[in-house]
Design a protein with these regions (language model features):
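Short Pro-Gly-centered beta-turn/loop motif in secreted/extracellular proteins
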Residues: 386-399, 403-406, 492
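Short amphipathic beta-strand segments in non-cytosolic proteins
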Residues: 360-379, 461-465, 469-470, 475, ...
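C-terminal motif of bacterial Sec signal peptides marking the signal peptidase cleavage site
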Residues: 16-17
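A short, amphipathic beta-strand motif
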Residues: 343-356, 603
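Aromatic, loop-rich ligand-recognition surfaces of beta-strand-rich domains
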Residues: 431-471, 479-600
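Hydrophobic/aromatic-rich core segments of domains that either
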Residues: 24-33, 46-48, 183-203, 212-223, ...
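Secondary-structure boundary elements
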Residues: 40-41, 49-228, 264
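Structured interaction patches on ligand/partner-binding surfaces of diverse proteins
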Residues: 405-431
Length: 603
């Protein structure tokens, strides 16, 4: 990976002196070496035959020096993680698969692979095939008339998504998914690519996806992501892109380098409607494409991946010998403003609020916290005695930093940029100690979904095993926010059977349930566990889990409605107290564990 970045930075340097598009193309052809003749064949073919195809070929070739793929024996070892996870038993943790592959093949590192540059290897037949298929779907689809040439080049034409092995993927994927749109093409909405994308996403969501971010870091997988459905957000976004681009729908991937409220980056898909507006989705979790400005992600800075390098950024950065690695290869555009809408802010700090000496034009980085350190997510140039960052999303804590080529140093105090107002509030240590009550180790993610699924759930008592008649003793009105929620029941009536019944659409998600005869009791009532058998996907999330004493296991009913879990006490008992735990990500505070609080001031 390091050698690739060096090559890209070196190559970018060759282009910095280019003042015209022809010079960019000539420089790319010169870098092709012995492969120049193959690329020239493509240009010669289209120069007289089709002006648009010639321009498209120029676009691909002039940016080709910055693209390539990895190869080597270790690549197959890496791909095993994804292919074997498809059939790996649900009852076993993914770490078991990882450990097994490490024992068999050794530790994987991307440094074990060899990087092959497209400019030196892509032949004319390959390039012509992709150009012909891209133009076919662009010109034949009813929505193609709303896709301009520049959008086509950037978000339909590219033959690759990232650094995956080269392949002729368009024809096979087109023939597989095109029939889904046959009836749609006859409708009045057939000119809207967003509606077509919705139909395709409906089909893609039917697959069984297995999400994990625990696999080693490696290259993109290529179109095999469509048959494996395993990996993280990167693999799932790639799958969507292959299908949409094969059908001539302009799309791609937007991302944040680091989330404002989590120690991770994130990728998601975007699609452009017939007016060029951005709609986004996270496959397979979201059912519909939504407007970009409605995305509730903690923003900071949002970037759109592109095949073409940002030529203007290359020219601006050319005079700087030390640029933070994430910005040396600018295959992206800043699209923050598309997401922030009216909450699009400017962060401007004068030199009086910065530590150190800055000269006119010095680079300054905007940073978010990531795993005990600050990570740059944007840059600007120090001008007129201030560091000014345009288009920033709020709702996160930032700092500014300088980079010397080896390490960076914070040059401002941390500050909160308020999402709604854009106001900057600096974070300074308080002189006095404060008391905090913490219920979780980090912010809610999936837990929001799981916690909310308990809203509308009920605790019921009955003297009939089938609950043919029952009394509702508790209605859960709010999402639980702690590991154990204690609810006191007001009924004096004894019951032989008691249960928790989940609300419709919630798969009866619950982790722990306990019934107590008296409010002061610490030992729950015991009996025969009863409930609706069957759990979603893997048969390891049965109703029995609600009474196993382990808050890390849970009940996930096979159907969204009608699930319940409970207990037959053998004889009627009064129950004054119920304790329950929502299905969770093991994110709660556990008694007996040792925790350490870290302040952003000291990161």
């Amino acid at each position: 990976m390091k050698h690739w970045c060096v090559w890209v930075w070196f190559t970018a340097g060759l282009f910095m002196a280019c003042s015209s598009e022809n010079q960019w193309l000539d420089t790319a052809l010169n870098l092709a070496g012995d492969n120049r003749a193959e690329l020239q064949k493509v240009l010669d073919r289209y120069k007289e035959e089709d002006g648009d195809k010639y321009r498209a070929a120029c676009f691909l070739i002039e940016n080709m020096p910055f693209h390539g793929a990895y190869e080597g024996k270790a690549l197959e070892n890496y791909r095993k993680y994804f292919s074997e996870y498809v059939s790996f038993p649900y009852s076993r943790h993914v770490q078991e698969l990882i450990d097994s592959l490490k024992r068999a093949d050794g530790e994987f590192s991307i440094n074990q692979l060899t990087y092959k540059r497209d400019i030196m290897t892509v032949d004319s037949a390959f390039l012509v095939n992709h150009i012909e298929w891209a133009f076919k779907v662009w010109r034949e689809q009813p929505w193609g008339k709303h896709v301009d040439f520049d959008t086509f080049c950037e978000y339909i034409l590219p033959y690759r998504i990232g650094d995956e092995p080269l392949s002729l993927w368009r024809k096979e994927i087109y023939e597989c998914y095109s029939p889904i749109l046959d009836e749609f093409r006859k409708t009045d909405e057939a000119d809207n690519p967003k509606v077509a994308a919705q139909l395709l996403m409906d089909t893609l969501r039917k697959a069984n996806y297995r999400n994990t971010a625990l696999f080693p870091v490696g290259p993109h997988l290529g179109p095999d992501v469509l048959k494996w459905h395993t990996g993280s957000c990167r693999e799932f976004t790639d799958a969507m892109i292959y299908v949409l681009r094969a059908l001539g729908i302009p799309c791609g991937v937007d991302r944040v380098m680091v989330l404002g409220d989590n120690n991770a980056s994130h990728f998601w898909n975007f699609v452009l409607d017939k007016e060029g507006k951005t709609y986004i989705a996270n496959l397979p979790y979201e059912e519909v494409w939504s407007k970009a400005e409605e995305y509730s992600i903690s923003r900071g800075k949002m970037y759109r991946a592109t095949y073409s390098i940002d030529k203007e950024a290359v020219r601006k950065l050319g005079k700087y010998s030390d640029v933070y690695p994430a910005f040396r290869c600018p295959f992206f555009r800043d699209v923050t403003a598309l997401y922030t809408g009216s909450r699009n802010w400017t962060v401007a700090l004068p030199d009086s609020l910065l530590s150190g000496q800055f000269r006119e034009g010095d680079m300054v980085y905007l940073c978010l916290a990531n795993r005990l350190q600050w990570q740059p997510i944007g840059y600007t140039f120090f001008k007129k005695r201030e560091a000014r960052f345009e288009d920033v999303g709020g709702g996160a804590v930032f700092t500014l930093a300088a980079w010397n080529g080896k390490e960076y140093a914070a040059v401002s105090s941390p500050f909160l940029l308020e999402r709604e107002t854009g106001k900057i509030r600096f974070i300074v240590p308080e002189a006095e100690k404060q008391e905090l009550v913490l219920y979780r180790k980090c912010h809610l993610t999936l837990s929001v979904l799981f916690n909310d699924r308990m809203i509308g759930g009920v605790v019921e008592g009955s003297d009939r095993a089938d609950f043919g008649w029952k009394d509702t003793l508790l209605l859960i009105k709010e999402a639980p926010y702690r590991l154990y929620t204690v609810a006191r029941l007001k009924s004096d009536k004894p019951y032989r059977y008691m249960r928790y019944k989940g609300a419709d659409g919630c798969f009866c998600n619950i982790s722990e349930l306990a019934f107590y005869e008296n409010t002061e009791d610490t030992i729950p009532l015991y009996g025969e566990i009863i409930g609706t058998p069957g759990s979603f996907e893997d048969n390891t999330h049965e109703y029995l889990n609600a009474f196993d004493g382990n808050p890390d296991t849970s009940f996930d009913y096979i159907h969204p409605d009608g699930g319940w879990t409970g207990m037959d006490f053998g004889s009627p008992h009064r129950v004054e107290k119920v304790v329950y735990t929502p299905r969770n990500e093991v994110n709660f505070i556990y008694k007996g564990n040792l925790y350490e609080l870290l302040s952003l001031i000291h990161i």
